[in-house]
Amino acid sequence: MRSRTLAVAVVITASSLVVAGCGSKGEAKSTNAAGTGTLAIGASLSLTGKLAREGVLTQEGYQLCQEKVNAKGGIDIGGTKVKLDIQYQDDTSKPDVAAQLVDQFNDKGIKLILSSYGSANTEAQAAVIERNAQLMVDSAGADNKIFSKGYKRTFAVLSPATEYASSIVKAIAELATPKPKSVVFLSADDGFSKTVTEGGMKTAKEAGFTVLDPQYFPNGTSDVSSALTKVKGQHPDVIIGSVHLVEGVAIIKQAKELGVTPTGFGESVAPPTPDFAKTLGAQAENVLGSSQWTDATKGTDKYFGTAKDYTKDIQAKYGHAPDYHNAEASAACLALVLAAQKAGSSKADAVRDALSGLDTESFFGKIKFDSTGQNLYKPMSVIQIQNGKALTVWPTESAEAKMIWPGTK
């Protein structure tokens, strides 16, 4: 590089890619008015399109991380203090666009990346990351398939997709009285949701449930009536949705309209999201959901404090209680920050090596990566909507409330 000033920029812009200063393709750099650099990290987000709500929650988590890190003077990289400067690029919820944006970051010399929202986008990005010798910390791409391809440059702070429905099944098997006998999975047809279903069905069979044939519908649809009609006559005790927010809301609404009345509902992704209970009102009561994080999570770190502290900060900054999309985004950013500090460098290879050896406590729980890039320590929690709030009911050692069963009246 022509200058010795260290620079890093977290690049995520809603309208245009902003690169601080100039530099070689190996490293982006800049100098602020006070003479300190900025650490460059690129990230596209689903700010519009079918995943926009989850994408905005991810953005909030990244923004809070930037605020917390910079409030403590930034990051010490080899003796030089640098600030995070997160700017956003909208991938419109499309995997091909998310991949193209990673290439654009690379063309600008941005080697450090925070992931988009969702498994399809993240999987598309991971292939480009590997090709370009970039580095990505994944906040929201949970599909196990991402980590079965031998990639060495993508690290995920979250639990894999197979755990989403499996956690709900385990909670019901352990806590539901009387124990239900049959379960059916209603699933969107995207890769993540299918993997959620596969994991849930396997766990349900192992737990002794009668598992009915799953029903699939288009990803992002708001009409799941056909799938519900097909299972209505089978009278399943439990319906579990492998879904995102839009499909999850549709299942609960249309089940009531069609008179589909299991003893309980569970869903991936949707119930912990604030919009779920807000949209459904009383219909959301007692629905179970799997969550990557709750404010009962154990652990602390110097930037965010505890899970309770994190909850207060999100509430104060954004006017709503946090959900796990916020938390996993902040945790991904935190992991990248800690690795850069540990490496004493902003070079992708050095930060990758530091991530490989990272073993730390955080507000998100413990973070340590295995050889595939997945978080070794990451369990999932199960929440239940009670009086309009998402309360942890499983595992019991971190429960905020007892699970209400039957979950429907």
Language model segments and positions:
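Short, solvent-exposed loop/beta-turn-alpha elements that line the ligand-binding surface or hinge
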Residues: 73-82, 298-301, 368, 387
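Extracytoplasmic ligand/sensor domains, especially the bilobed periplasmic-binding protein
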Residues: 96, 110-213, 263-289
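Short, low-complexity disordered leader/linker segments with a strong preference
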Residues: 1-40, 77, 107, 408-409
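Beta-alpha junction/loop-to-helix N-cap segments that form part of ligand/metal-binding clefts
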Residues: 25-34, 54-57, 75-148, 157, ...
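Extracytoplasmic "Venus flytrap"
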Residues: 32-65, 89-95, 117-120, 186-195, ...
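Extracellular/periplasmic periplasmic-binding protein-like sensory domains
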Residues: 255-330, 396-408
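Segments of small-molecule ligand-sensing domains
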Residues: 313-326, 337-392
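Signal peptide-proximal N-terminal region
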Residues: 60-85, 178, 208
